[in-house]
Amino acid sequence: ASDVYKRQELFPNAISKRMDWDTTRGKFSFDKIINSFAKQEIDILIGTQMITKGLDFKNIGLVGVINTDHFLNFPDFRAHEKAFQTLTQVAGRSGRSGDRGKVLMQTYQPEHPIIKNVIENDYEKMYQNQLLERKDYNYPPFVRLIRITIKDKSYEKLNNSGDWLNRVIRDNYKGIVLGPVYPEISRIKNKYHKQFLIKLRNLDELNRFRSIFQKIQKSFDSISKYRSVRIIVDVDPI
């Protein structure tokens, strides 16, 4: 509400619209907002990342990205690659009939390599830096990944079952095992989540771990107090 008030105070004559999940739930809501903006019936369009998804607007003089650091600090090994893609897409939306528009990015990390790559539109440098980083920290394409997620309504039961799995996995597999940790969103539909991440050097190692974990899961399923805990195994998670 304060943002709306501030916007009206700064641009009293401007017509503005929001584009997010709430405002595009209706059958034709998305298209209606897009068409209105294309016809210049809307002066300021404020929204989430969906604004960048394949939309090509003309006559945009200024694009602003709020909290760019959210993209850079997201807990995912692909975060920097995705940040570059999104910010480059956003920058590409700005311009009037062949003239260059302006892009403003709010950040506490103006010297961050990804911010510099975006400003310089240097995909090759971003690509090479990301390859080196992933090789150093054992991430794809240099390893395969298995993500194991456990879910339960009981916080205590989830932690206890996670401790059991952690001990048994590490006793039976001597490769790289990370976790268990709570993901950024740790409770969905009234269930708590915890995750393991297994890093595997090749397909043989992946198959060996899957065979080991199938036996572990059988033992886990036989423990009555953990019967409600759900296990999801995701190979090469996206």
Where are these regions (language model features)?
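Accessory helical-bundle/CTD segments and flexible terminal tails appended to RecA-like ATPase motors
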Residues: L10-K17, G26-F74, Q89-I238
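Short, small-residue-biased leader/transition segments that mark boundaries at the very start
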Residues: A1-Y5
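Short, conserved loop/turn and helix-capping segments at secondary-structure boundaries
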Residues: F77-F84
